[in-house]
From Swiss-Prot:
Cofactor(s) the protein requires to work: FMNH2
Protein name (Swiss-Prot/TrEMBL): Chorismate synthase
Subunit structure as annotated in this protein's UniProt entry: Homotetramer.
CDD domains associated with the record: Chorismate_synthase
GO MF annotations in UniProt: chorismate synthase activity; FMN binding
Length: 364
């Protein structure tokens, strides 16, 4: 099975399954000398881990990460960093009834057809449990980006079902279980989720992620444009069905006179492009959004078929998130961090000595 790595200079490779012994990853290309401990990664892992609120799956995993290699006396050595998280709360018996049954909307059917067999326990490799290692690797990238280059990355839930944030207060994001920036909507979100759980159904969500302090010049046209690699990384998150950079699909109804980001010696007057022009970072905040589908692991009966081609009814019995978007915020942050880290190292390798006499613009 290929496709388990991302990046060229900062390379992250993950391994492991939802109900396997452990999850792990290898990070290649991290510069030496970065102070790094398990605690640096644990904060983001705790933000992502299951069982932390009544709105997420009841599966309880501590997600305690261990550093196996690449760190000596508290600093990265420049060699491969090995990370491991053991699975401790598997209940594989919850899935015995779907051993030969395809869950609609899941990867069961496609994995079976591609590989000729599948790990039916919680979806195996296709489970979002795998993203724990992306979050761990992303935390390493986030620390380097912030400590060495002053780059900050912040994600938040901008919409859950029909409820959208009308204000953006970053101080509220970590104060509630939804990572929601609009405190006035928290009561409505709570009520909506309560009713959703009663019905046994699920709902989709929109997650936004912003990177500030990104220097001008990251991105490698034409096939490794920064926005293309960001879209690739974000689209690779489980349940993501859409990615927007900047105004995204909103540009369809914009006129050129509205959508262009006007410039002056004082800076850019807007950021419709989301901080990327021609596939290269402009120095403005990088803004991306992802749409996550509602999980089809629900207790509402649905029609499907068995591996033998017979009709069957599916009712999910395992422990699942009624809205997978709630735990997706640190995952989106991690994937953006991994891409920015990779492109920063690539830019440094080729363009470190480039000197442009054009003034660097900020936001007005």
């Amino acid at each position: 099975m290929s496709g388990n790595s991302i990046g060229q200079n900062f390379v992250v490779t993950t391994f492991g399954e939802s109900h396997g012994v452990a999850l792990g990853c290898i990070i290649d290309g991290c510069p030496p000398g970065l102070e790094l401990t398990e605690a640096d990664m644990q904060h983001d892992l705790d933000r992502r881990r299951p069982g932390t609120s009544r709105y997420t799956t009841a599966r309880r995993e501590p997600d305690e990460v261990r550093i196996l290699s690449g760190v000596f006396e508290g600093k990265t050595t420049g060699t491969s960093i090995g990370l491991l998280i053991e699975n401790t709360d598997q209940r594989s018996q919850d899935y015995s009834n779907i051993k030969d049954l395809f869950r609609p909307g899941h990867a069961d059917y496609t994995y079976q057809q591609k590989y000729g067999l599948r790990d039916y326990r919680g979806g195996g490799r296709s489970s979002a449990r795998e993203t724990a290692m992306r979050v761990a690797a992303g935390a390493v990238a986030k620390k380097y980006l912030k400590q060495v280059h002053g780059i900050n990355i912040q994600g938040y839930m901008s919409q859950l079902g029909p409820i959208s944030a009308e204000t953006l207060d970053f101080s509220q994001i970590e104060q509630n279980a939804f990572f929601f920036p609009d405190a006035s909507k928290l009561e409505a979100l709570d009520e909506y989720m309560r009713e959703l759980k009663k019905s046994g159904d699920s709902i989709g969500a929109k997650i936004s992620v912003v990177a500030t302090g990104v220097p001008v010049g990251l991105g490698e046209p034409v096939f490794d444009r920064l926005d293309a690699d960001i879209a690739h990384a974000l689209m690779g998150i489980n349940a993501v069905k859409g990615v927007e950079i900047g105004d995204g699909f909103g540009v369809v109804t914009q006129k050129g006179s509205e959508g262009r980001d006007l410039m002056s010696p004082l800076g850019f007057e807007s950021n419709h492009a989301g901080g990327i022009l021609g596939g290269i970072s402009s120095g403005q905040p990088i803004v991306a959004h992802i749409a996550l589908k509602p999980t089809s692991s629900i207790s509402v009966p649905g029609q499907s078929m068995t591996a033998q081609g017979e009709m069957a009814e599916v009712v999910t019995k395992g422990r699942h998130d009624p809205c997978v978007g709630i735990r997706a915020v640190p995952i989106a942050e991690a994937m953006l961090a991994i891409v920015l880290m990779d492109h920063l190292l690539r830019h440094r390798a080729q363009n470190q000595d480039v000197c442009s006499h054009t003034p660097i613009l900020g936001m007005r």
